[in-house]
Amino acid sequence: MSRSYNDELQFLEKINKNCWRIKKGFVPNMQVEGVFYVNDALEKLMFEELRNACRGGGVGGFLPAMKQIGNVAALPGIVHRSIGLPDVHSGYGFAIGNMAAFDMNDPEAVVSPGGVGFDINCGVRLLRTNLDESDVQPVKEQLAQAMFDHIPVGVGSKGVIPMNAKDLEEALEMGVDWSLREGYAWAEDKEHCEEYGRMLQADPNKVSARAKKRGLPQLGTLGAGNHYAEIQVVDEIFNEYAAKKMGIDHKGQVCVMIHSGSRGLGHQVATDALVAMEKAMKRDKIIVNDRQLACARIASPEGQDYLKGMAAAGNYAWVNRSSMTFLTRQAFAKVFNTTPDDLDLHVIYDVSHNIAKVEQHVVDGKERTLLVHRKGSTRAFPPHHPLIAVDYQLTGQPVLIGGTMGTCSYVLTGTEQGMTETFGTTCHGAGRALSRAKSRRNLDFQDVLDKLADMGIAIRVASPKLVMEEAPESYKNVTDVVNTCHDAGISKKAIKLRPIAVIKG
């Protein structure tokens, strides 16, 4: 029996201007409450989605995000609450922008591939340069072309970094350490990666032959979808101290943002795990509200296999971003006829947006070991946290928020409040407002390209027809999303960047 929209509203309560509570009973079997962070504009989108669903209009086969946050709150072993960040939108199982933590000491607690997503360790890396916008403007087209030539892009693109099966095994196990050994990374790059670019529990044997076959040719490639490399300039500095620690000292300074993940390999790891977990759920009699929330007990063989395979896919993504960093450094060096070192092409930070990790958090006054699922959300640890690099001990961890093609991006820093409210987690980007199919129907790709050109943005796209799926109109406003997190206190704004060139799959 489905409830009317007004009945649904009985279960929703506004805590403050940026946060709503989802009370138990909104969906069956909720173990904990849900919350979601919004501002006025984003709130309207969330409630419209719920209203449409009550009228029987689905969200491209997914439940509305609010329902998905509720269903995650019903998973065995969840602690504290199920959290929706301001860029939350419907996804497979978990909404994208939904995070949740599970108690590692609870034998019933689960791990769910839908809580990580298909593009395991999809993430963002930001490089700085000592160039100014005035240095780059005259050679902008040339630079965009050089990056497009150096970095393989598009759906079926193949990597240029030589890889054989043995290399792949080692890369899956070693992450950035592999790139370092092979000469594709600088030693300091590693310090500025989440997890130092290597998840230690990775086991290449838990990655299927099919996944490896998909992953081998794609290493060091950009892929399609929402993946891109952007040449950006610093548009605004909100926190000068934090910016200086990141090597950013003036407006107009040029940066490069790389947004990519584990390509076909991560997708296959997730698919394989979902099949295995369907069986494990029957065996262990695990009940979930939504079939897409297939999961397994953390301690079960299926749970452990997935975590080891997921870590290997995570390492693959870090190697991938390292390879693209290497190619970006080459492209810049070529155009400016100097060395990457002389251009100060250092990694500011590299964050993951889709990952599950074992972390220590204080819940109800007690320190607990939790498996934190972050899907379409970003780790945002506060100052003095032992897991962040020495350079950022006083500022808090840098958090990289990619906007959409042709809109601004942000660098945020983690806060103590975020640590207590959201397990040290904040938003990850703009969050879709229109489905991919709707975007293709509503927008014409030439209009999108022309609009970017009018904004003075150089663009190189491998598949122009995919451009409208990623047009700014298809997304929520990234500034709304970032400001909501800032006002809620779960992360603070440090730097705003705007694009001058986009390279895209």
Curated annotation (Swiss-Prot):
Remaining remarks: Ligation probably proceeds through 3 nucleotidyl transfer steps, with 2',3'-cyclic phosphate termini being hydrolyzed to 3'-P termini in a step that precedes 3'-P activation with GMP. In the first nucleotidyl transfer step, RTCB reacts with GTP to form a covalent RTCB-histidine-GMP intermediate with release of PPi; in the second step, the GMP moiety is transferred to the RNA 3'-P; in the third step, the 5'-OH from the opposite RNA strand attacks the activated 3'-P to form a 3',5'-phosphodiester bond and release GMP.
Active site: H428
An annotated GO cellular component: nuclear envelope
Similarity remark: Belongs to the RtcB family.
Function: Catalytic subunit of the tRNA-splicing ligase complex that acts by directly joining spliced tRNA halves to mature-sized tRNAs by incorporating the precursor-derived splice junction phosphate into the mature tRNA as a canonical 3',5'-phosphodiester. May act as an RNA ligase with broad substrate specificity, and may function toward other RNAs.
Assembly information from the UniProt record: Catalytic component of the tRNA-splicing ligase complex.
Binding site for Mn(2+) 1: D119, C122, H227
Cellular localization per UniProt: Nucleus; Cytoplasm
Residues with Phosphoserine modification: S300
CC cofactor note: Binds 2 manganese ions per subunit.
Main location as per UniProt: nucleus
Named cofactor requirement(s): Mn(2+)
Residue sites binding Mn(2+) 2 per the record: C122, H259, H353
This enzyme's EC code(s): 6.5.1.8
Molecular-function GO terms, alphabetical: GTP binding; metal ion binding; RNA binding; RNA ligase (GTP) activity; vinculin binding
Name listed for the protein in its UniProt record: RNA-splicing ligase RtcB homolog
Record cross-link Glycyl lysine isopeptide (Lys-Gly) (interchain with G-Cter in SUMO2), residues: K496
GO biological process, one term: placenta development
Membrane-spanning residues: none
Description of how activity is regulated: Protein archease stimulates the activity of the tRNA ligase complex with high efficiency in the presence of GTP.
Pfam family, one: RtcB
Reactions catalysed: a 3'-end 3'-phospho-ribonucleotide-RNA + a 5'-end dephospho-ribonucleoside-RNA + GTP = a ribonucleotidyl-ribonucleotide-RNA + GMP + diphosphate; a 3'-end 2',3'-cyclophospho-ribonucleotide-RNA + a 5'-end dephospho-ribonucleoside-RNA + GTP + H2O = a ribonucleotidyl-ribonucleotide-RNA + GMP + diphosphate + H(+)
Residues the record lists as binding GMP: 226-230, 353-354, 402-405, 409, 428-431, 504
Keywords attached to this entry: Cytoplasm, GTP-binding, Isopeptide bond, Ligase, Manganese, Metal-binding, Nucleotide-binding, Nucleus, Phosphoprotein, tRNA processing, Ubl conjugation
